[in-house]
Amino acid sequence: MEKEKLTNRTSTHKFNETDRETNHSRRHRHHHSRHRESKHGRHDRSERPSSREAGDRSRHERFSKEPLEVKKLPVENEYFDSKFASASSMPSSKDNPQNNDFTNSLQGLDFGTFGSRIQREPIDRKSNKPGEIFVGATLQNESSTSTEHKDIEQLETEINESGINYKIGDNGSRWRMMKLKRVFDMAQDQRRPVEEVALERYGSLKEFDFALEERDELELRKRTRKVQKEVPTGELYEKRCADEFKTRKDSGNGATYYKVIPDPSVNKDTPTESDLNRLKADLLRAQLKKDPNYESLEREYQKACDDFENSLHPSENSNSQATIPSKKRNFDDPTIDEMVQEEKLLNKQRKYGQNYEYAKQIAKDKTYSNNLDYLDENAGKLSNRMKRGDVSLAQISSGGDLKKINHVLDTCPLCLNYETQPLAPVISLSHRAYVSLPTQPELAKYHCLIVPTGHRINTLSCDEDEWDEIRNFMKCIALMFDSMNLGVIFYENAPSPQRYMHTAIECIPVSKRILSLAPAYFREALSTSDEEWSQHRKIIDTLEGSKKYGKWAFRKMMVKELGYFHVWFSIDGGYGHVVEDEKAWGRHDQVPRQVFASMLNLPPEVIRRKGSWTGKKDPREDMFRSRFEKFDWTKGLID
């Protein structure tokens, strides 16, 4: 027994040693094989047996005298070559007849594709065809259906190839909205169709519809604070084309509607809706540009309309013209709305015109007599009243509300005429302008105003005589403050011409040091007052322009039709700014008063002016009049 145990231990020991040597040699061969692979590449790896197969072969050689031949079958997938046994190791169907059904079901299958990702079939988005189109009872072909399908496909292609390189709400969005607003304003002023003006400004209605879509999205974001889309999708342009197609289709014979019956005798050269739209756009461009080929394009368009109409109505005469509605407005044949608007304007002019004002003035005057002496003696009263009538007519022609304008004129605290005195105090008076004092709180001691006697919305609307008298007052006030060793800054704030408020020039005394720093303060304030993208220059340097235009720099470089702000650092010029957004600019001189508050270290309550003129005597009048008396140029008029 002991000998048998010893023999078993010896054999076991030898077997373990043999196993360790085999494992060592295997690791050694594996190390060299990795070295060869890294040196020579891995292109021949599939030709060598794997490490698992080599280990299995060594075990069979140790425990079996007869070597086991392993035949490698060609398998397309390396993954299954290393994970699954070869076909020779599997039991045949003869040995196990129960697997016949299983093996028969696996015939013809490619196991190399098992476990791979399922490829999704591409989706044809153009297969989402629109609903069935119904046309008139006289239609006996499918030309309209194929036409609409072609139009929709072409429309999608145009929208996809539109090349939109911006996003809704980006830095250029404000500029695009201003361009869109100018299109509507121009169409209203010139009484032209919006589409015609848009085609002239944008070049195509597609770009115009993109701008409309962006405007709707911005308004939706303001209301809901949600982003629906980043870029225009072309929905409005698609709807426009569909509406135009429907309008032209409905303008036919008005028969009952049923489904289209296919007709093999359709002419493939028949123009489509998109062809008509393209020809119409070319015709309109040629008309706007006065192209000499306009007549040929018109004939081509008319022929295309005839062909298209004949394709829709094959039973009718082929020479009949197609009745396609046009959006061009004919001024020789005005609409009912235009005639009503014109009649209202004429009634206003007849009611509130010069004859009405003249008759009203005569009725109030008990001393009236129809002779030249009376006209000479009362020429001043009649002329002042006629000026006011001219102002009202100008506002009527520009679309203003006459009732609102008359209310502003009747309640204006700065107008000075023979009938009413201004509520503001009058320090010095000339023929066309006067010096007054502002409401409380004032920006500085001896703060004063230069006001035209007539109701002017800005000083640019004043004539040359009025402007000369205003400049005379500016010179006198500058001399008065210079005698006090002070500088002066003049500014005019007229941001809203449509409100028709009486303008005035503010005169604020400052120290000489602050006067030298004032241009930097106002440059910074005007640069940040509006949005980054604006149509006009942020700052119009009239001080630099005075070197070329002299005292007329302000009147030549600014425009009276636009709301503006202007500050004078000298008598001849300073900085001008066109106010594009009245709400952002604010009311009651908010921007300039903020600048003066920062320069002069004023409290916050001074920024907003809350006072008003009462018509009572102001205690500041005597103090200012005593200072200004020696510099008053109107004394020469009295003498």
Swiss-Prot record:
Composition bias (Basic and acidic residues) maps to: 14-24, 44-75
Localisation? Nucleus
Which residue windows are coiled coil?
none
Polar residues bias locations: 95-105, 312-324
- Assigned GO CC terms: post-mRNA release spliceosomal complex; Prp19 complex; spliceosomal complex; U2-type spliceosomal complex
Q: Which UniProt keywords apply?
A: mRNA processing, mRNA splicing, Nucleus, Spliceosome
The region called Disordered is annotated at 1-75, 86-105, 309-332
List the biased-composition ranges (Basic residues).
Answer: 25-43
Q: Which InterPro entries does the UniProt entry name for this protein?
A: Cwf19-like (IPR040194), Cwf19-like_C_dom-1 (IPR006768), Cwf19-like_C_dom-2 (IPR006767), HIT-like_sf (IPR036265)
Q: Name one GO biological process term.
A: mRNA splicing, via spliceosome
- Please name the Pfam families in this protein's record: CwfJ_C_1, CwfJ_C_2
User: What family is it from?
Assistant: Belongs to the CWF19 family.
Physiological role:
Involved in mRNA splicing where it associates with cdc5 and the other cwf proteins as part of the spliceosome.
Q: How does it assemble?
A: Belongs to the 40S cdc5-associated complex (or cwf complex), a spliceosome sub-complex reminiscent of a late-stage spliceosome composed of the U2, U5 and U6 snRNAs and at least brr2, cdc5, cwf2/prp3, cwf3/syf1, cwf4/syf3, cwf5/ecm2, spp42/cwf6, cwf7/spf27, cwf8, cwf9, cwf10, cwf11, cwf12, prp45/cwf13, cwf14, cwf15, cwf16, cwf17, cwf18, cwf19, cwf20, cwf21, cwf22, cwf23, cwf24, cwf25, cwf26, cyp7/cwf27, cwf28, cwf29/ist3, lea1, msl1, prp5/cwf1, prp10, prp12/sap130, prp17, prp22, sap61, sap62, sap114, sap145, slu7, smb1, smd1, smd3, smf1, smg1 and syf2.
Q: What is the protein named?
A: Pre-mRNA-splicing factor cwf19
Source species, please?
Answer: Schizosaccharomyces pombe (strain 972 / ATCC 24843)
Which lineage ranks, top first, belong to the organism behind this chain?
Eukaryota, Fungi, Dikarya, Ascomycota, Taphrinomycotina
